[in-house]
UniProtKB/Swiss-Prot annotation:
Assigned GO CC terms: adherens junction; cell cortex; cell surface; cytoplasm; cytoplasmic side of plasma membrane; cytosol; focal adhesion; I band
Domain PH: 380-476
Compartment(s) where it occurs, according to its Swiss-Prot or TrEMBL record: Cytoplasm; Cytoplasm, Cell cortex; Cytoplasm, Cytoskeleton; Cytoplasm, Cytoskeleton, Stress fiber
Tissue specificity note: Detected in adult heart muscle (at protein level). Detected in heart, skeletal muscle and testis.
Lineage of producing organism: Eukaryota, Metazoa, Chordata, Craniata, Vertebrata
InterPro entries in the record: Band_41_domain, FERM_2, FERM_central, Kindlin/fermitin, Kindlin_2_N, PH-like_dom_sf, PH_domain, PH_Kindlin/fermitin
Gene giving rise to this polypeptide: Fermt2
Entries under Gene3D superfamilies matching the protein: Phosphatidylinositol 3-kinase Catalytic Subunit, Chain A, domain 1, Pleckstrin-homology domain (PH domain)/Phosphotyrosine-binding domain (PTB)
PANTHER family associated with the record: FERMITIN 2-RELATED, FERMITIN FAMILY HOMOLOG 2
SUPFAM superfamilies: PH domain-like, Second domain of FERM
Region (Disordered): 141-162
Protein name as it appears in the record: Fermitin family homolog 2
Amino acid sequence: MALDGIRMPDGCYADGTWELSVHVTDLNRDVTLRVTGEVHIGGVMLKLVEKLDVKKDWSDHALWWEKKRTWLLKTHWTLDKCGIQADAKLQFTPQHKLLRLQLPNMKYVKVKVNFSDRVFKAVSDICKTFNIRHPEELSLLKKPRDPTKKKKKKLDDQSEDEALELEGPLIMPGSGSIYSSPGLYSKTMTPTYDAHDGSPLSPTSAWFGDSALSEGNPGILAVSQPVTSPEILAKMFKPQALLDKAKTNQGWLDSSRSLMEQDVKENEALLLRFKYYSFFDLNPKYDAIRINQLYEQAKWALLLEEIECTEEEMMMFAALQYHINKLSIMTSENHLNNSDKEVDEVDAALSDLEITLEGGKTSTILGDITSIPELADYIKVFKPKKLTLKGYKQYWCTFKDTSISCYKSREESSGTPAHQLNLRGCEVTPDVNISGQKFNIKLLIPVAEGMNEIWLRCDNEKQYAHWMAACRLASKGKTMADSSYNLEVQNILSFLKMQHLNPDPQLIPDQITTDVNPECLVSPRYLKKYKSKQITARILEAHQNVAQMSLIEAKMRFIQAWQSLPEFGITHFIARFQGGKREELIGIAYNRLIRMDASTGDAIKTWRFSNMKQWNVNWEIKMVTVEFADEVRLSFICTEVDCKVVHEFIGGYIFLSTRAKDQNESLDEEMFYKLTSGWV
């Protein structure tokens, strides 16, 4: 009698085989295979397809082990090596699945994404589909829940999302030539967009290759979508405090693991966002979609009050939005009439903006590099202390290298200063009110026990621009001899100029006030403070300062102004520091870590990445430890988020700092994983 059909108590048969259960998701069918532990994964899939006997392309399918939350992608590995036994339940499922992506402009698109790829690779493929360069700056985020609202039914959530759905077909990752452009920079790249209005220079079929997107409206991703109704804005989640902002950052996906491993389901809605606030090589010729989506992310951050700005700044941002909305409507009609001469003029005008936004260096010839410029002027200085009513005191201040020396008078400047401030590593915050002629600079200077707070008050815009630019450079360890100093001064002056009120508002024609919708241009805080007519008048006054800008220039100016805000580029996390008893905030920016007061957001202490020796994570107790020069050691536990997210932010910024324009190769994925994945 044959023994091969006799089943033993352990589930194995007498001949050494055992039954493996596989669920085929496409057919919703369970299949049982007789296998041994020596059968490799590829052999299991072959047996499965033969047994199914269904004529179908199975090439995209792979085995997924639900219990272990892992893909079995190494087809040469045996079942024994994978640790699979008779009790394992496997799924045979497509690797590419549908995902609903909310873009930075808040619109949804349906995309097919590889659920078995690491998220970093999946985002790179998504960005190729959308023709967005530098995908390393973006990532995927789970949708934050509004804690102030009761749990809603899924149907209610879906109906809200449908109002923001982009029309058009399913977007598939394509293989057209447009996607083969290098991830970093290439001197041989052909301009893809008109630098004047951001529309494609080539026909859409060539622009998007064979992608399904070419069947719809590819230009939609490069065109700003105005907020259509105040009701949509009112329904959206607005963080009420810094702690709410910090909780939003719980949702960042792990870039080193796949979507399936992180429990992302097919057709789930995820947010595609610029994660790292370090934008490299922004170029209007190639980056119309990238610039527009960056502008949209900045716009929504202001409207939803995710970032603070002054009243004058909000009116300036509203005026730029109004201008961009008007020009976006005109773009499709006027694009064919643009001459090459116009594009050349805009190229020249935008060159400074490109340099500023990418953080690069100018090509201007330096002057005498042996002499470092200095500033010397009367400045009012204030050192706030508890239980004191003393105000600003005027000093003769000289700014040399990265230090400010304060003297009681100009005549005493050859002697010993009354105060000396070393600004290397300090926090620099503007406090400006144009109409009130207030031009203050707040400095938080690192000392052994924390931060010393110093305020500088300037007399006028010109003085403020020079001293503010010098302070910003000094905080990074740079002097006024740096080639970016003059450009920084000009950018500050231009930022202030855009906030000026027009002296003669009667010049605004009555007929154009009707197309301004202030409820969709300013944040709710200012809507509550003023009547709609008052806001409209102020927006139109501010619009006269930007009315001559081209579409792309206006978007670039908006991004640049966003970057100038004190809170820009800081990602917050709730943390408990070693030795501390209460919860505080840790802020991560492109160049530093900031310990912050959870209620006020004030910086308690700052540490620069340039002084960092190493950082590591104790995965058992979830503690992040960062070591700096001078034996400084920082340890904290993240209370509301996996410490892996914080670890990835630090490593991600270190990775981005290694980028250079002379690199022609594609992204070094392995280097990114080494810096961010950790020992999980």
